[in-house]
């Protein structure tokens, strides 16, 4: 019989703190005048923004809470990942988007091209 896991390991509690610390670190860099480049993809050679003295942050949708806001502009049948990403950018609910001076995204799908 397969044992179903119902509780999260204790280490998961640290994730929220680490996420908050990451947001505060980006805010501190912005206060120091360091430009921030937000990247959706791993195709961006991180050496390019770093050579300009910029910090690089990964942009990734972590929830579907912003999808209703995105659907005010985007079609309902568009990929949830695209709608969530767009929603976080539109609503300023993600500090990484908020502090990004430049956002780099790939064109791996029609949704990302249109976003």
Show the residue positions of the predicted features:
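An N-terminal assembly and electron-transfer interface module characteristic of large anaerobic redox
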Residues: 1-115
């Amino acid at each position: 019989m397969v044992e179903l896991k119902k509780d999260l390991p204790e280490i998961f509690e640290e994730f929220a703190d680490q996420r908050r610390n990451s947001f505060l670190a980006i805010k501190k860099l912005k206060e120091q005048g360091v430009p921030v480049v937000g990247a959706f993809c791993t195709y961006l050679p991180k050496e390019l923004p770093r050579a300009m003295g910029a910090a690089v942050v990964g942009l990734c949708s972590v929830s579907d809470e912003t999808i209703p806001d995105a659907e005010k502009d985007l079609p309902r049948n568009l990929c949830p990942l695209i709608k969530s990403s767009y929603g976080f950018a539109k609503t300023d609910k993600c500090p990484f988007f908020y502090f990004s001076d430049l956002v780099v995204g790939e064109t791996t799908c029609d949704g990302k091209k249109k976003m």
